[in-house]
Amino acid sequence: MERRDNRFAKGVLTGILCSLAVAAAATWGIYFLLTTRQKAALPQEEQAAGLDYGEIEEKLEKLKTMVDASYLYDVDEESMRDGIYKGFIASLGDPYTVYYTEEEYKELQESSSGEYVGVGVQISQDPSTNLITVIRVFRGSGAEEAGLLAGDVLYKVDDEDITTEDINNVVAKIRGDEGTTVKLEVYRESSGGFVALDVERRSVSMDTVEWKMLENGIGYLQITEFDGVTYSQFTEALTDLKSQGMKGLLLDLRDNPGGRLDQVVEITDDFLTEGVIVSTKDKNGQGSTYEADEELAFDGPVSVLVNGNSASASEILAGALKDYGRAKIVGTTTFGKGIVQNIYPLGDGTAMKVTVSDYYTPNGTSIHKIGIDPDVAVEKSEEEDGTDNQLEKAKEVLLEELS
């Protein structure tokens, strides 16, 4: 598998992969979500250094005068203002350092909490066809009750054709107040026709953890991202699998782009009794160290499935378990995002996400732009019978540990 396939890159950086009523423009990775009291603050001398803001203001006034005098179309002053701020941050050349408008920041907060008001689906947009497809339907959602299915292709929202629209605009059309409904028309390949559904908007918890028992005492647990509800869902899953007699755990982190640091630290801690989980270091050599406590949630053998789209927080979990020999890593080399972002509210409803530090695995290794190599390398192959060859290899590795 290509380590950074086009679909994944678009999902991580521009929000091609998004959940309805969450931030379509949110960039993933690993980050601290700070409270509104923790606003961005820089020393005065740093604010003034390097840039002549008087000259910049003068230049902007000239540009604005020229636009007002000559530009053919109407000007959205708010969009122009936001564009200035976004361009300023984008000039850093770091795709993970981002300015959020008030609306984007509100959506980001909903996204990172894992709870929001919406129809309860995750969608993706094909950049070549512009078609938007449902890829997940969350449990207990209005979408599930209405009968929306993964694989459905979205064509209309409230009788309005959306096949030429950007995914962000479509998300905005589907969003609404709790208890209200939206009419969605989808094409369903299995039935070869269009289906119209009235879907209620509800308070929804995103399903970031899925699990089931496999044969031979193997429990399967997939984490799709790390947000505010992930650890509680992970605990529920692990408890249920153990109650069913799980002897070995197959942990699937494939295509997991990352998320919140606090959540992945909690999960990693459940597999370790001591030692460093991850450490960080900023440009001044300062940082934090996160360590495991003595409590152990599962002491059986573990296989971890990863691929080139397993990034950031996923790599913290896989890296720690690998460094301590706590699990066998199976699959392909991970994405290689070894940096941490802080999100700073700016006091006016907007916010900025800034890359602030590198992170290191327990052995002191930086995996940034390198990734984590698996213990057992297995490229994904397309089997005619639909067999997941990577999953089968991980099961084989786990059975060897259990024997």
Model-derived regions: residue spans:
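Cleft-lining beta-strand/loop regions that shape enzyme active-site pockets
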Residues: 2-4, 135, 144-149, 158, ...
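Intrinsically disordered, Ser/Thr/Pro/Gly-rich linkers and terminal tails that flank
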Residues: 1-125, 149, 156-157, 162, ...
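Short, structured beta-strand/loop micro-motifs enriched in basic residues and often containing a Trp
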Residues: 132-138
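Conserved P-loop NTPase
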Residues: 341-345, 352-384
